[in-house]
Amino acid sequence: MKTTEAGKDAVKLLKKQNLVPVPDAPFPSFYNALSNKVYIDSSLNPADIAVNLAGTARQLHHKQVLTKLDMAEMKAADGVQCYRLMQADAEAHKALMYYALKSNEALPYSPEMPGGISVHSVIIQKAMGASDEKALDAAVKAFYNDHQAVQTCDLLYARNQHLTAYNIDRNPSLAPGAKLFSKDMPDKIFEKICSVGGVPYVKQEDFNKTPFKIMFQNRRNDIARMVAPFSKDTSIMKMPTFEKVEAANAAARALATKNR
């Protein structure tokens, strides 16, 4: 896979949408599911628009992989993990597009560096000669080191899923037969989320480790309370918490000091 292939994949997805320029928009670019349109801040330079559209195109890809109903029916723990990964994938693609444009000195415009950890991971990986696949894989995994970004994902998951579940619960005709927060995540879904042209660039089993599942306890409890009116699903309570892991680490350090 080359950067041009990732770009072509993004263009295919964006071609199907109505792109709406908005001067001084509150976001560089974003997809509105209700209007099925992509809004772009037309005051940005073309390079910055391209970087942000790379991330928005991934949102459209995710929409094809997991529908809103799929997310509503997925058990909370699995839903949280998918939601995080989708954001990580979008950030990784923005970072790769930034690197490609920044590296091309012939372009008349230069993009601003995106925020977050992912872009630094891409720059380091590409400087070491890594392929685009490896750079994307590393960028996705680096995203999880930004605990504030991950916690924001968890907050957005809770808000969005509560609204969806509430609407379906009040109006069953919106999704006849839907069983909220009841299903396990589909097989190999991580590899489908993180794929370009149908080719995955991550391995699902890499994300079974604690660093990719850990949560703040208060956010975990908030999600459990959100799910309770709609389902008996308690999967979220099995997710490890920073507080518990830190307590275990502190106990281990104390024991090591005592045994010196």
Indicate residue ranges for each PLM-predicted region.
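Auxiliary, metal-adjacent structural segments of Zn-dependent hydrolase domains
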Residues: 1-38, 42-46
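Structured segments of extracytoplasmic/periplasmic soluble domains
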Residues: 4, 60-64, 93-104, 146
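Active-site-adjacent bridging/hinge elements
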Residues: 28-32, 61-70
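Soluble non-cytosolic domains of exported or imported proteins
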Residues: 43-52, 77-85
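Active-site recognition of the HExxH zinc-binding catalytic motif
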Residues: 50-65
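Substrate-binding clefts and substrate-entry loops adjacent to catalytic sites
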Residues: 66-80
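Post-HExxH zinc-binding segment in Zn-dependent metallohydrolases
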Residues: 76-120
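Pan-zinc metallopeptidase signature
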Residues: 125-260
